[in-house]
Amino acid sequence: MPAPTGNCLLYLDIVPGHPVQIRKLAGVRRYAALRGWDVVGVPRREMDRTDVRDLLVRHRPVGVVVEGSGRRNAFPPQLFGRTPVSYVEYPAEETAGQAPNVSIDDDAIADAAFRELSLGRPAAFAVIGHRHPHLWSLLRVRAFRERCARAGADCIAFPVVPGESTERYEARLSAWIASLPPKTAVFAAGDSAGAAVSRGARSAGRHIPKDLTLCSTCDIPEVCEDAPTPVTSVHLDFERMGWLAAESLASGENASVGPLFVSRRRSTAGRGRREPWILQAVGIIRAEACGGLAIDELVVRLRSAKGRPVSRRNFDRRFREAMGHSANEEILSVRLESACALLAQTDMRVTAIHDFCGVGCYSNLDALFRSRFGMSMSKWRARNASRG
């Protein structure tokens, strides 16, 4: 096998245009740019040992990053000879002790989704994976079912039927949604499954979020926000995964990426059928909490919109009944989610972030952050932000 002599990095087995892999590729490119490398993406196709050797001879890359999500081919580390190789979402048992692997912490995802869905005090839980039995989906479904079991809650799983037609899948999904008990909280292993549930609920005659609540994973805006009911999603930093995979070519270290925060949308915005004004309040909070929105101001605006009195005490009580937590807690969650996004995705000074989260001063935000996450903002950034 030829020794690496070129100035490029190969990203192997990617699906062009896939929103998750676009983000991973961006992370690989960010790291490569710091090292002065070019990045060559190799689209997914049937490949054998000869194909891999031809790629290595042609490019003589400084390293290879192998995509493992939804893979069709096996790329064992020994296939690459003296060329450094790392993996992203590849089966851990196939790389253990031989090459670094960047994985997703499915238990942490399950915890985040369970907490979000539990806020609405559901009567039951359900889970759905990707329509195809990808390993990442099966692991995520299992993690959520185990999380429910630890809480003493049953979890209704949508069964996967490999190879079924789209028409059959949609009909079966609609029937499953129709059969769910009232006030069921549904977790989808990925955004595509979450969007499918959002569509299927309409044909099943079920209303999200008044009858069912829904949370998915990945937080791809073009998928979540285009669903009939926009879908709340656990945010994963795929760009950071790509960065870590490229970085691990030199460090040789495994890495695990957990969720940054939950992007809340209408699919978890309360469930009181006779309380549309509570849903309006949630929308205002999620849009304006980081602008310094106060509860008293919100109550005044709702009073004007309803055209009749809304007392602060009545608002607090009705909001908690519908959402399972107070309006102040909703505002705090939105502000902390914004802080996490700024810490992970920008180079903004930690001491300046409070100005963009609606919190009066750095010390107040730092205290709130430590209470929620058990660590300082600086430490959280060191663990979760892409460097460079």
For each predicted feature, which ranges?
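Nucleotide phosphate-binding site architecture
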Residues: 263, 337, 378
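ATP/adenylate-binding site constellation spanning eukaryotic-like Ser/Thr protein kinases
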Residues: 122, 336, 374
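Bacterial carbohydrate/catabolite-sensing allosteric modules
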Residues: 1-65, 70-301, 312, 316, ...
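Terminal helix-turn-helix DNA-binding modules in bacterial transcription factors
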Residues: 321-360, 383-388
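Basic/polar phosphate-binding segments, predominantly the helix-turn-helix DNA-binding elements
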Residues: 296-330, 354-379
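…primarily DNA-binding HTH/wHTH and HhH modules…
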Residues: 268-283, 356, 363-388
